[in-house]
Amino acid sequence: MRRHGDTLVASTNFGRERRVILAGHLDTVPVIDNFPPRWLEPGDPLIREDVAAGHEQERGLWGRGATDMKGSDAVMLYLAATLTDAKYDLTYVFYDHEEVAAEKNGLRKVVEAHPDWISGDFAIIGEPTDCGIEGGCNGTMRFDVITHGIAAHSARAWMGKNAIHAAAEILNRLNAYENRAIEVDGLTYQEGLNATLISGGKGTNVIPDECRVHVNYRFAPDKSLAEAKALMIGADAGAELGNGEHVATGGVFEGFGIEMKDESPSARPGLTSPLAQSLVKLVRERTGRDPLAKLGWTDVARFSMLGIPAVNLGAGSPLLAHKHDEQLPESDLLLMANLLEDWLK
């Protein structure tokens, strides 16, 4: 076992012809009165109706990280402790800082510092998928759209220019934007463009001289990061991570100031490799589920950049990730363990 920062990498070396990577992030989003996690006995009022359906006599694991993704981490730890006769060599990766800006991502740091630690023929990330397969992922970028004004006393507003009022046009463009559903290699990815934060003003009696609308764009894997950025701010705006504010030369936010905050590429489904096909076949036989598109960003994109085919497969519903009542039925953990155990033996 090797460690880089808060990321642990453990590998078997039995001389198998192929190597499979099992990866899971250790961090969660902030708690919302849902920590520490705990088991809920059948009938507990905290068990959601949609989770209880079909699992009436089952315990549920409740609390922050239950689905995203401590449940899957637990399954991988179980496999690491018990699976001694796998037909592939295995690398387990448990990493930090997945839920924050890409520059802090523990997997990214390991890849940059020790690329030989993260080598393999196929990777599975335990993001919540209801134990089905979700292929690829949307890309993501976050940026501030900025308006500028002139500060003045609010009793003499005509002496200034209100940057918050000017931001109304940013919101108008967001409201007018039509998010698209895009098919890539047989899977349908839903794009999204949303304001997630807004800030402006320095005092309650001061006309604001700046307003920032923080925007998150989730884009399908039919386009590169550069192509997605061009759709938002133009191809030659010059806005890059860490280089300050630039004016959008085209795209949705043409004419506004832009400061890039975070960006990560998308990944195509990655289901064409023989290892992926054999896993798809097993999951379909056991659950009746065909692969779906992963709508959020995950580190399958990072494996894709390394030339390693990767899919998402984990316990719990992706619809409950980050929710205050995050939870999963106990059988999801058993199903994930059984699927991976049988596929790896």
Where are these regions (language model features)?
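Acidic/His- and Gly-rich active-site-bordering loop/insert found
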Residues: 1-66, 85-87, 245-246
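Fold-independent oxyanion-binding glycine-rich loops
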Residues: 4-6, 24-26, 96-97, 126-129, ...
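Glycine-rich phosphate-binding loop signature in dinucleotide/nucleotide-binding domains
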Residues: 15, 115-119, 306
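Hydrophobic/aromatic beta-strand patches that form the interior of the parallel beta-sheet core
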Residues: 20-22, 93, 124, 309-311
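Acidic/histidine-rich catalytic neighborhood of metal-dependent amide-processing enzymes
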Residues: 69-142
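Metal-dependent amide/peptide-bond hydrolase catalytic core
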Residues: 128, 135-136, 142-345
